[in-house]
Amino acid sequence: MRIEVIKREGNTFEFYLEGEDHTFANLLVETLHEDKHVKFAAYSIDHPILMARKPRFKIVTDGKESPEEALEKAAQRVFDRARAVLEAWKSAIEG
């Protein structure tokens, strides 16, 4: 996974997230939408074959937090949820 910055201007951040597809991209966008300071968050895949694992993201915030801060917070929430699922899974299989 690698972030390639396309544009950073004001409260807008656009970037590619190399190595990911719709599965993670949709999860990240939905998690960004939970942030009250995020006014817009979406992704697209420019070409379904050539760029299938390189979604393009756009995040716009209200200025009370930067798009990068919103991205970091969303990534942490995704990580925390994945950890909770793993712990629940371990508890379930251990009895």
UniProtKB/Swiss-Prot annotation:
Assigned keywords, A-Z: Cytoplasm, DNA-directed RNA polymerase, Nucleotidyltransferase, Transcription, Transferase
Family of this protein: Belongs to the archaeal Rpo11/eukaryotic RPB11/RPC19 RNA polymerase subunit family.
GO molecular function, one term: DNA-directed RNA polymerase activity
Entry's Gene Ontology cellular component terms: cytoplasm; DNA-directed RNA polymerase complex
Protein's name in the database: DNA-directed RNA polymerase subunit Rpo11
UniProt subcellular location: Cytoplasm
Function, in words: DNA-dependent RNA polymerase (RNAP) catalyzes the transcription of DNA into RNA using the four ribonucleoside triphosphates as substrates.
Superkingdom of the organism of origin: Archaea
Main localization (coarse): cytoplasm
EC number per UniProt: 2.7.7.6
GO biological process: DNA-templated transcription
Catalytic reaction(s) noted: RNA(n) + a ribonucleoside 5'-triphosphate = RNA(n+1) + diphosphate
Database matches in NCBIfam families: PRK01146.1-3
Family matches, as InterPro entries: RBP11-like, RBP11-like_dimer, RNA_pol_Rpb11_13-16kDa_CS, Rpo11-like
Organism: Thermococcus gammatolerans (strain DSM 15229 / JCM 11827 / EJ3)
